[in-house]
Amino acid sequence: MELYQLTIHELQNKIRQGGVTSTAIVNSVFGRIDAVEENVHSYITLMRESALEEAQKADEQIRTGEINALTGIPVALKDIYCTRGVRTTCGSLILDNFIPPYDATVVVKLREAGAVFTGKTNMDEFAMGSSTETSYYGFTRNPWDLERIPGGSSGGSAAAVAADECIAALGSDTGGSIRQPAALCGVVGMKPTYGRVSRFGLIAFASSLDQIGPFTKDVEDCAILLNVIAGYDLRDSTSVPVDVPDYRDYLNRGIEGWTVGIPKEYFIEGIDPEVRGAIEQAIRTVEGLGARCREISLPHTDYCVAVYYIIAPAEASSNLARYDGVKYGFRAADCRDLLDMYKKTRSAGFGTEVKRRVMLGTYSLSSGYYDAYYKKASQVRGLIKRDFEEALKDCNVILTPTTPTPAFTIGEKTDDPMQMYLSDIFTISANLAGIPGISVPCGYTQSGLPVGIQFLAGHFEEGKLLQIASAYERNAHIEKRRPIL
């Protein structure tokens, strides 16, 4: 087995035993990138030179016995985090030449833990999309079928982990942008509780929904990464001062005696039969571990998509108002005056989907429509949150499909925004409620496409998610396949 195929914890063991160097690991990963990146297109910007320098520093630390949580481990970053001295585009022309003067908090934490950054991964422009097709830099392909999408908006990170172009990666999740691509690419992806991980240095899409989380090859690696990135940050006003446990302590506890809720509203017409079959088998596996699965109701589920597509665009229209070509980023040429520069810069700098959502959000916030749309959506959001609070009083966790279908073909839904928006129908609710969720591989379709199962828990109960995800992963006996590239 090649080094690039291993997990964080497997590489950690080899490093501690003196059997491998960080330089060898990084060279192995970049060798893999050289072999498959042309087909997959996971990255916008590669950081090869700095990665090799960081690997050499890591090897010096290893020789002195100074080994941290991620020393020498190659990690990819979604191109939505500010990285000092490294271009950060958010998948958009309007930030094509933007080089931040500072690092996001998660970047600082990963660096302090010893991680080696391989590059900045592709994404839907400003995280607005479910397929990584709206990126200014071209679409990413699903490693399992190069004619299909990897999911979005963090499709580049998910594809990079699935294709072994990194050992792990970070993404962001506003309505499912970690969990959905994780499911479609056959990897583990977690959205932590809102406020668990600092958003300082994350380029905002919808500030009350965005959350940063990991993509990994297994659940143990997810716990390792979460240990590093979680925690309170004074620089983020939405960060919550809650103690961070050692998440690896939850991995071997089992779930005997647990109650697992199965929301009836998530098993609706339109779910692909093979996805339904994989989820039903997963439920049987969970029951075999000593848990009791019972049907529950989340009565306001039908409103989730509508509420999300009022609140998220409204917040986006405000957040994206800062991109005007004045101080940084793309600036249109041949402008008559300041207003003309604003208009031409934003018209040319933003893609179609971003402009669609900005216009939608501006409309819902406008005078005469605020009460009818944004205020009402915010009220229904409160009801959705209460649904989860009531359900989780009687359940340890909730189990659902991550996506209604496997990965669809490239271009299949680009002309039908509503169909694209429905790709996140099972993931949006967790963002609206602010609760954590994790997607874990639970099988494959007959054509070999991955299927994911989602677990949801109460606020700051990531430990429970890792506990059931780890128990399921160990006992489901899902065949360990790798995409052929």
Curated annotation (Swiss-Prot):
Reactions the enzyme catalyzes: L-glutamyl-tRNA(Gln) + L-glutamine + ATP + H2O = L-glutaminyl-tRNA(Gln) + L-glutamate + ADP + phosphate + H(+)
Broadest EC class assigned to this enzyme: ligase
EC number(s) given by UniProt: 6.3.5.7
Active site residues of this protein: 78 (charge relay system), 153 (charge relay system), 177 (acyl-ester intermediate)
PROSITE patterns with a match to the protein in the record: AMIDASES
Disulfide bridge partners, by residue number: none
Pfam family of the protein (one): Amidase
Domain of life: Bacteria
GO molecular function: ATP binding; glutaminyl-tRNA synthase (glutamine-hydrolyzing) activity
Keyword ATP-binding appears in the UniProt entry: yes
UniProt KW keywords: ATP-binding, Ligase, Nucleotide-binding, Protein biosynthesis
Subunit structure, interactors included: Heterotrimer of A, B and C subunits.
Sequence similarity: Belongs to the amidase family. GatA subfamily.
Function recorded in the entry: Allows the formation of correctly charged Gln-tRNA(Gln) through the transamidation of misacylated Glu-tRNA(Gln) in organisms which lack glutaminyl-tRNA synthetase. The reaction takes place in the presence of glutamine and ATP through an activated gamma-phospho-Glu-tRNA(Gln).
Annotated protein name in UniProt: Glutamyl-tRNA(Gln) amidotransferase subunit A
Naturally occurring in which organism (per UniProt): Syntrophus aciditrophicus (strain SB)
